[in-house]
């Protein structure tokens, strides 16, 4: 079958032993819940070697490799990807090539066309599971580099950080070697994510950038629950409901526009 070799499982432990993940090859155990892996249930841990993931079609060591194998979810059966604590680079920050957009659009780190996609960190601290990029306008890109371009209704992101660390240091608490200094200190447009769809939810997610941060901009309706955002100007999503969120503004004008449905802030600071 598709079980990992026993020796690679025996020694498995996630980067945060205080919230253990038991990995048994074809299933996970986390927070007293058993998760059976399969065609619509993937597990990703950047610690795993290529050899360790080679024999398992549902286990990956990079988010991008997992994304290449997503199949469309439905409301009843979403496409779920579970992420162990790590820093997952959506775009290689060490690649010297300049990113250029196609068809008059911004350059993207990753375009994901998958309805009812659930991206879930296996740790209650969002800063421990990071989806990262480090490019912006004139900084490794022509145009406003945007880490993600999501297409599809029903996107859920939970218990993780989405950050464009072009002008913000990435300080990773669980393993110093995974931290990275910002690309530059001048403020430039460095986007996090666009989203084309409805019924989008972000739960306990940190969105980090500065100018034009764009946390899942473009959604018809989106709920941000218990999220934290750092940005300057023209950055927040217009038709969003922000519930129990913390917002750190480093500028005067956080919205570009909010006339598509109005933004609602409940119990935020």
Residue spans for each PLM region:
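Glycine-rich beta-solenoid repeat tracts in large extracellular/virion proteins
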Residues: 108-112, 131-132, 146-151, 169-171, ...
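Surface-exposed cleft-lining segments at the edges of enzyme active sites
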Residues: 52, 188-189
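Sequence/structural signature of small/polar-enriched beta-strand/turn repeats
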Residues: 137, 170, 242, 259-265
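Short, T/G/N/S-enriched strand-turn elements that build extracellular solenoid repeat scaffolds
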Residues: 33, 61-74, 89-113, 213-219, ...
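Extracellular "leader-to-stem" segments immediately downstream of a signal peptide or signal-anchor
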Residues: 1-80, 99-106, 127, 136-138, ...
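Solenoid scaffold repeats with emphasis on beta-solenoid/beta-helix
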Residues: 42, 81, 117, 129, ...
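Right-handed parallel beta-helix/beta-spiral solenoid domain characteristic of secreted/periplasmic
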Residues: 58, 90, 95-96, 103-104, ...
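Feature marks extracellular polysaccharide-active and adherence modules
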Residues: 45, 84, 120-122, 151, ...
């Amino acid at each position: 079958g598709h079980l990992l070799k026993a020796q690679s499982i025996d020694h498995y432990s996630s980067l945060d032993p205080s919230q253990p993940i038991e990995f048994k090859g074809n299933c996970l155990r986390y927070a007293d819940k058993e998760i059976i892996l399969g065609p619509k249930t993937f597990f990703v841990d950047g610690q795993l070697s290529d050899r360790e993931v080679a024999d398992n079609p549902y286990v990956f060591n990079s988010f991008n490799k997992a994304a290449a194998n997503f199949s469309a979810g439905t409301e009843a059966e979403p496409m779920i990807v579970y992420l162990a604590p790590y820093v997952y680079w959506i775009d290689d920050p060490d690649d010297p090539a300049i990113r250029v957009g196609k068809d008059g659009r911004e350059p993207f780190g990753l375009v994901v066309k998958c309805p009812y996609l659930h991206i879930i960190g296996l740790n209650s601290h969002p800063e421990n599971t990071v989806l990262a990029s480090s490019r912006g306008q004139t900084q490794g890109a022509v145009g406003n580099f945007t880490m993600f371009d999501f297409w599809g209704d029903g996107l859920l992101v939970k218990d993780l950080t989405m950050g464009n660390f072009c002008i913000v240091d990435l300080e990773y608490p669980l393993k110093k070697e995974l931290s990275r200094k910002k690309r530059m200190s001048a403020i430039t447009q460095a986007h996090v994510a666009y989203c084309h769809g409805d019924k989008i939810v972000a739960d306990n997610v940190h969105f980090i950038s500065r100018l034009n941060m764009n946390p899942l901009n473009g959604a018809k309706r989106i709920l941000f629950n218990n999220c934290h955002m750092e940005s300057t100007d023209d950055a927040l999503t217009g038709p969003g409901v922000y519930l129990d969120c913390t917002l750190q503004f480093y500028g005067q004008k956080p919205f570009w526009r909010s006339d598509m449905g109005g933004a609602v802030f409940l119990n935020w600071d």
